[in-house]
UniProtKB/Swiss-Prot annotation:
It catalyses: RNA(n) + a ribonucleoside 5'-triphosphate = RNA(n+1) + diphosphate. The keyword Transcription applies. The lineage of its organism: Bacteria, Pseudomonadati, Pseudomonadota, Alphaproteobacteria, Rickettsiales. CDD domains: RNAP_alpha_NTD. This is DNA-directed RNA polymerase subunit alpha. The gene is rpoA. DNA-dependent RNA polymerase catalyzes the transcription of DNA into RNA using the four ribonucleoside triphosphates as substrates. It comes from Ehrlichia chaffeensis (strain ATCC CRL-10679 / Arkansas). Disulfide bonds: none annotated. It holds the Pfam family RNA_pol_A_bac. GO terms for molecular function: DNA binding; DNA-directed RNA polymerase activity; protein dimerization activity.
Length: 372
């Protein structure tokens, strides 16, 4: 498959059209880091449980640059489904059974069905990559995975899984071999590589599904920063088998992508031209605090309320609590939500404690930042 896009189509898809290169004549300098540092990054990642199970959750990531939610969501979903490592039963030994095309007297399921059931058993190991699980049962009973006792280093996650059904007086002895891996490994592939002669003669390979992800999907919605609504919100819905949590699965997928992208970065960030160290670069707090509130895209009502309360800089604003703001005349919940969203986009919030505020020469420092 060939994927090809030019800059004009990307600009049109994003709702913008290029009008010329403002930097070609040396009017402004673009540092290497500007290509990524100037982009909007998510101010929050919210984990919302889906129901009572901790294994299902929605992760809400916003705000993102237009188009980024689809790009990131698709990459994260594919990596989660294909590349996360987990544990699975890859083979069994059943007493008096030499191959899978066998029926066992007194056992209602044939060996093929038993292997299919066992392949769906979910296991979590701690501090090891492999383990042999043993189970001895006497009928009549239903043999379920929960009959395998948990230990400090091994937990059966789906304890109600039916393995087989025994009639009166039937003994059922089985060993299950568990190891770590990724993706799906069919039994035929396992047989082709197990030619070392060190496995038991009655070892039967099983299909092994190692992925800890049961379901993963995503959707894209619009997000906003102030009055601008051309941003993305990414909502990822993840369900795991219980060996890891949904937010851990997304974090691992992101780390895999980070590692895979590393070879594409063919420059050293330390080679950038040395930038003059300004006083503003050594301030002990966020530079956004020096911006004036009239730079924010506030509604007229919200701006007038701040002005009447003598709030000039964002640093003045964030030191107010929500209760303080709601006591301001004509300032209501709608204005509060508007300000909270704007502050969150800058990784700020109401009720912050800022030492040594305001700084000396705040007016000149604020002007330097506005000109940057």
């Amino acid at each position: 498959m060939i994927f090809d896009e030019d800059s004009n189509s990307i600009a049109q898809d994003s709702g913008y059209m290029a009008v010329g290169n403002a930097y070609s004549n040396g009017v402004s300098y673009i540092s290497m880091s500007d290509h990524w540092s100037k982009l909007t990054k998510p101010s929050s990642i919210k984990v919302v449980p889906s129901g009572a199970s901790p294994n299902k959750a929605d992760l809400i990531i916003e705000p993102l640059e237009s188009g980024f939610a689809l790009t990131l969501g698709n990459a994260l979903r594919r990596v989660m489904m294909s590349s996360l490592r987990g544990f699975a039963v890859y083979g069994v030994e059943i007493e008096n059974v030499l191959h899978e095309f066998t029926s066992i007297s007194g056992v209602r399921e044939d060996v093929t069905d038993i292997l299919l059931n066992i392949s769906m058993m979910r296991v979590k190991l701690s501090g090891m990559n492999s383990k042999v699980l043993s189970l001895k049962v006497k009928g009549p009973c239903e043999v379920r995975s929960g009959m395998i006792p948990d230990t400090d280093d091994c937990i059966i996650l789906n304890k109600d899984l039916l393995i087989c059904t025994l009639d009166q007086g039937v003994d059922f002895n089985i060993k299950m071999y568990v190891n770590a891996g990724k993706g799906y490994v069919p039994a035929v592939k396992r047989k082709s590589v197990n030619k070392l002669g060190d496995i038991p003669i009655n070892f039967i390979a099983t299909n092994a599904l190692y992925s800890p992800i049961k379901k993963a999907s995503f959707k894209v919605e619009s997000s906003r920063i102030g009055q601008f609504t051309d941003y993305d919100r990414l909502i990822m819905s993840v369900e795991t088998d219980g060996s890891i949590l949904p937010d851990e699965a997304v974090a691992l997928a992101a780390r895999i992508l980070q590692d895979q992208f590393q070879p594409f970065i063919n420059f050293d960030e330390t080679d950038e031209p040395h930038k003059k160290v300004d006083a503003k670069d050594t301030l002990p707090y966020d530079s956004n605090l020096l911006r004036k509130v009239d730079e924010l895209e506030l509604s007229v009502r919200s701006y007038n309320c701040l002005k009447n309360d003598n709030i000039t800089y964002i640093g003045d604003l964030v030191q107010k609590t929500e209760s303080d703001m709601l006591r301001t005349p004509n300032f209501g919940r709608k204005s509060l939500n508007e300000i909270n969203e704007l502050l969150a986009s800058m990784n700020l919030h109401l009720g912050m404690k800022i030492a040594n505020w305001p700084p000396e020469s705040i007016e000149s420092l604020s002007k330097q930042y506005s000109e940057e």
